[in-house]
């Protein structure tokens, strides 16, 4: 009964754009299926996707005073 009062959140599968109800029972969310999930994983493995980051200051590591050498 609580579910009927709440609006079901629907999202589009990132791979095939099929509408998917966002709920804990969907083990593949936000994907619609294991197949779409694996297609996306393959895209990351093939470096089809990237995550941009600020490179400024990322590699600046200072050694503490008296560090062993």
Swiss-Prot record:
The keyword Zinc applies. Its cofactor is Zn(2+). PANTHER family: DNA GYRASE INHIBITOR YACG. Keywords: Metal-binding, Zinc. Binds 1 zinc ion. One of its GO terms (molecular function) is DNA topoisomerase type II (double strand cut, ATP-hydrolyzing) inhibitor activity. NCBIfam families: PRK00418.1. Zn(2+) binds at residues 13, 16, 32, 36. The lineage of its organism: Bacteria, Pseudomonadati, Pseudomonadota, Betaproteobacteria, Neisseriales. InterPro entries: DNA_gyrase_inhibitor_YacG, Znf_NHR/GATA. It comes from the Bacteria. Interacts with GyrB. Inhibits all the catalytic activities of DNA gyrase by preventing its interaction with DNA. Acts by binding directly to the C-terminal domain of GyrB, which probably disrupts DNA binding by the gyrase. This is DNA gyrase inhibitor YacG.
